[in-house]
């Protein structure tokens, strides 16, 4: 490819978006920012636009768009401001775009990510919900469009690096026995079970290793994040749920492992910094400097592993059940979790009630086949309705 790659960053003001911009800025001859999108931190989006001079910016509604357009003009920029989901899809699929960082959190990221896939882009997938909600439809679109799908979650990027290039032939065909997803265990890995009832949002968001947004920090604490990653791994690598094992590894130095039938286990190691998988995906199949410090094994000293405790992490069990059920179950799991986590962060429910809401939603609604995107969003809406009804009956 001649000239720099033009990059759209969906979710530019989040932690993944900011890390992407850090890597991009290190290689101005290789990458050029084409579009930036933001949702609520619009002052930060303005500052990023001034720094990176994209051709487009996208915000959620018209009032914010007019203000941002005026502020950009005052700064001497001719960046064009677009609005809403239509704007997101436009900058994701734009003919001038080479690569799209899909980093919008939650179900809101599905349509623009799918737009990038259908346009045949190189898609750097940080929005795991896109695959969780609509895995079969999403992967079918990848195959039909010829899009290049590169995982950004550190675990899936690690697996991608440890698998042979022809893994699409099937894990069995390339000699893979199982995939092992590592997890830090979050802030409550050793908290006495009786104390979990009184966990606060601030405690749940204080991750011991990674710096993340509030929603994903809670998901990490409950290990729902790992459950969603299990479902994502099944779609990315055409694995059965029983081929994906979760291992708690508190140091977060080994990002995941691949176990082969000959007894070999390949692992990818690195300091816990999202710039590593971002740089790997941006440059693939080449390599570029990410700005991450070299790994110092002498300083780390030891690596520990343990099996997840199902009583401590019921969300992981629920996610595995949804993966095994298939159909509408993963979309409903994700939607119920989004509602429950938002309620917990707002102080409306207790920490341990997150899993209870999700389990009730999954138990109340039968699993149905997902034959199109409308069915995905119908399952999502139904789960949100049921979770909302639970909150009306039970919130404190």
From Swiss-Prot:
Enzyme Commission number(s): 1.1.1.267
Catalytic activity line of the entry: 2-C-methyl-D-erythritol 4-phosphate + NADP(+) = 1-deoxy-D-xylulose 5-phosphate + NADPH + H(+)
UniProt binding sites for Mn(2+): 153, 155, 229
Pathway, per record: Isoprenoid biosynthesis; isopentenyl diphosphate biosynthesis via DXP pathway; isopentenyl diphosphate from 1-deoxy-D-xylulose 5-phosphate: step 1/6
Binding site for NADPH: 13-16, 127, 129, 213
Enzyme class: oxidoreductase
Residues annotated to bind 1-deoxy-D-xylulose 5-phosphate: 128, 154-155, 184, 207, 220, 225-226, 229
Domain of life: Bacteria
Cofactors that this protein relies on: Mg(2+); Mn(2+)
UniProt keyword list: Isoprene biosynthesis, Manganese, Metal-binding, NADP, Oxidoreductase
Pfam families cross-referenced by the UniProt entry: DXP_redisom_C, DXP_reductoisom, DXPR_C
GO process annotations (BP): isopentenyl diphosphate biosynthetic process, methylerythritol 4-phosphate pathway involved in terpenoid biosynthetic process
Record-level Gene Ontology MF annotations: 1-deoxy-D-xylulose-5-phosphate reductoisomerase activity; manganese ion binding; NADPH binding
Function: Catalyzes the NADPH-dependent rearrangement and reduction of 1-deoxy-D-xylulose-5-phosphate (DXP) to 2-C-methyl-D-erythritol 4-phosphate (MEP).
Record-stated family: Belongs to the DXR family.
Name assigned to this protein: 1-deoxy-D-xylulose 5-phosphate reductoisomerase
Organism the protein comes from: Pseudomonas syringae pv. tomato (strain ATCC BAA-871 / DC3000)
Lineage, broadest ranks: Bacteria, Pseudomonadati, Pseudomonadota, Gammaproteobacteria, Pseudomonadales
């Amino acid at each position: 490819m001649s000239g720099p790659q033009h990059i759209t960053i969906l979710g530019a003001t989040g932690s993944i978006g900011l890390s992407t911009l850090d890597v991009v800025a290190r290689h101005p001859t290789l990458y050029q920012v084409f579009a930036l999108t933001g949702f609520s931190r619009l002052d930060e989006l303005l500052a990023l636009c001034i720094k990176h001079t994209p051709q487009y910016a996208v915000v959620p509604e018209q009032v914010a768009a007019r203000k941002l357009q005026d502020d950009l003009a005052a700064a001497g920029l001719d960046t064009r401001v677009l609005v809403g989901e239509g704007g997101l899809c436009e900058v994701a699929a734009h003919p001038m775009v080479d690569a799209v960082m899909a980093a919008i959190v939650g179900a809101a990221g599905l349509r623009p990510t799918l737009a990038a896939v259908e346009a045949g882009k190189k898609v750097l997938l940080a929005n795991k919900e896109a695959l969780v909600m609509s895995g079969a439809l999403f992967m079918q679109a990848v195959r039909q469009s010829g899009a290049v799908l590169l995982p950004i979650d550190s675990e899936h990027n690690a697996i991608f690096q440890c698998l042979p290039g022809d893994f699409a032939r099937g894990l069995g065909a390339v000699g893979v026995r199982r995939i092992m997803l590592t997890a830090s265990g979050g802030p409550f890995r050793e908290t006495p079970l009786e104390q979990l009832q009184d966990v606060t949002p601030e405690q749940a968001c204080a991750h011991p290793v990674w710096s993340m947004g509030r929603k994903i920090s809670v998901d990490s604490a409950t290990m729902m994040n790992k459950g969603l990653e299990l479902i994502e791994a099944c779609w990315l690598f055409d694995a059965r749920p029983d081929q994906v094992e979760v291992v708690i590894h508190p140091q977060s130095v080994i990002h995941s492992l691949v176990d082969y039938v000959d007894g070999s286990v390949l692992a990818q190691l690195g300091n816990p910094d999202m710039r590593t998988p971002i740089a790997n995906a941006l440059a693939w199949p080449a390599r570029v400097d990410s700005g991450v410090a070299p790994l110092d094994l002498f300083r780390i000293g030891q690596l520990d592993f343990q099996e997840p405790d199902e009583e401590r992490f019921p969300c992981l069990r629920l996610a595995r059940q949804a993966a095994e059920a298939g159909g509408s179950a993963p979309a409903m799991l994700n939607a119920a979790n989004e509602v429950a986590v938002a309620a917990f962060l707002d102080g409306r429910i207790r920490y341990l009630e997150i899993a209870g809401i999700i389990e009730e939603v999954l138990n109340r609604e039968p699993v149905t086949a997902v034959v199109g995107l409308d069915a995905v969003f119908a399952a999502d809406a139904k789960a949100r309705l049921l979770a909302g009804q639970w909150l009306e009956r039970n919130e404190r």
